[in-house]
Amino acid sequence: MPAEGNPPQDSSHVDVVIDGREVRVPKDMLVLDAAAKLGIHIPIYCSHPKMEPVAVCRMCLVHIERFPKLQPACATYVSDGMVVTTNNTEVVKVREGMLEFLLVNHPLDCPVCDRGGECDLQDFTFRYGPGASRFPITDKVHFSKAVPLSEHIELDQERCILCWRCVRYYDEITGEKEIVLEQRGVETLVNTFNGEPLRSAFQGNLPEICPVGALTHREYRFKSRPWDLQRTAGVCPECSYGCNINIDSRDFAVQRFVSRDNPLVDDMWLCDRGRYSFPAWNSTERVRRPSVHPRRGTAADVSLGEAISTASRELRDVIAKQSGASVGVFGSAQSTNEELWLLQRLARDVIGTPHIDHQLEPFLDLSAAEHELGIADIEECDALVVLGTEPEAEAPVLTLRLYKAEHKRGARVHRVDAGVDAKQVGAAIGGAPRVGIIADETNRAHASAVASALGKGAASVRRLTITRGINGRGAKDLGVLPNVLPGYQASSRPGNSGRDILEAAAAGDVRALLFLGPNPALEAAGDLLERALRKARSVVAIDTRPSIVVQHATVVIPGHAVVEKPGSVTNVEGRVQRIRQSLPPATTTPAETRVLTTLAGELGASDWSSGDPLAVNRAMREALPAYAAAGNGGRALWTAGAVA
């Protein structure tokens, strides 16, 4: 009879009894997962939720009625009427024996091991192990300590318990096969293939999947204990993919980035570029105080109020003598949605300029189809076209999703140069029913042509455009562009693109420039940027770090780094994700949303909110139904109001 509260009987579920408790679970579920559903913990080392079971550690052995011997819970699937016991005398004795064997040669490194406090061997020994060992401590086998495998990873073979996770990670997740098992039997060791250094762009995941302290981060060596860290959920700031992370900080500094599993985005993996970018957020090279730098006169640090008053006075002067169109505004793909929402309102509604952008090149007309392919949807495609882009550089973790689609789901992945004719691409696909096209922003038009060529023969053709910056997609959604308003509505008064704004400033036609946030995209402008900055009468910079813009600004207002403020960002597929403040700001200046609100008030706006990020977020969602429907963690889609 089904357990109380369980769904009705059907062929896809079975009834199982574990430690006297009945539960209904899918028939393809492992005993390990069925026990977890009841809150019953079964210790294990080799099993990992993202990898296939191998049952090599033998820690998860359980008793199953009608089976002649104990069975591994990580590799045994449930069946109807199965009765499992996880803690009888036989099971307990075997667990104690396995732990005793694992500790025979394990060093007494806990006080100096970087895994201390988050080590499964340490935890399970206390919880399930014997009170004492029958083996003498003096007979332990020793190896070289802390052998560097790369600039990021160290290996301590004395601590290795041969769970095979690292080997399987390279076999199943990345396909790079950089770590192998050497020797056989009791001589078995984990090492890099042929002793070569690790070259993978995803090696930083190794210490996270290692259940002990055998593989550790060199950057985190002897830095902290987990109980001394303050953990904050965030989003990786290195690219537009939107990998979820935990930011661990201590003593007002970021100590490490740790993956935070989101199966719809990152599948719990991080790239090394993102994981090891955290030292940049501890940099002492910061803009800390407001300052004014008149074209003639002496630069000086001032109060925030004086800096904003000076900025508004300079902007009003340009508007009065020329017009609002004599002001150019630059946003940044590093800013939050809330900041970008206010910036485009400030530009269009208060200053009166259509000249606003966050990039240099013109933004071509948007096709709603660019938003249809979600990251998780990649696995459901029969064929994938990677068009003229290198995910390894633009969005590294995307390559792991492509590998999974190809090697676990059977999809065919075609990497195609941007110049290949659309009909040739269609011929290569060969009539696959479900097709995904992945391109970067420079190849959007070609991606559209390929989609049209494939549309007649495929049941579905969906596209994903890789944007630049942590919030490049958000900047476009929210209208930080010269030719479209928020929600991709066509502007009745289109302005100049970023490069054209700089050209006009260098020619003396644009007299004032307002910059919000660091903007690496401007570096491609070369000396044009410097000529524009020198020629402009007023340059207002709200920024976090010294830059060429800050160097030539007439008014500088400190900004908050992405780890120092709350808000939201939108990833490459349109997923709106919340970020939280992890560190105290390096400046006493309030967050950019409050600075922009105050500046708008100085320029004559009367209907703006307080600048509180939550209030700005509410106003933004009220104006954009797609963002309101997306909520926190959903996708903002612009195809007939659909939201996934």
Segments predicted by a language model, with ranges:
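Short, contiguous acidic and Ser/Thr-rich linear segments
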Residues: 21-29
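A basic, amphipathic helix-loop patch mediating RNA/tRNA/ribosome contacts
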Residues: 31-65
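Terminal leader/tail segments of proteins
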Residues: 2-15
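Catalytic alpha/large subunits of respiratory electron-transfer oxidoreductases
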Residues: 103, 107, 156-158, 162-163, ...
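Short, structural beta-strand-to-alpha-helix junction motif
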Residues: 29-33, 61, 336, 497, ...
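N-terminal leader/propeptide and maturation segments of large enzyme subunits in energy/redox metabolism
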Residues: 108-140, 146, 583-639
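Short beta-alpha connecting loops at secondary-structure transitions
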Residues: 16-17, 80-87, 191-195, 558-560, ...
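Fe-S ferredoxin-like electron-transfer domains
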Residues: 2-4, 58-237, 241-245, 250-253, ...
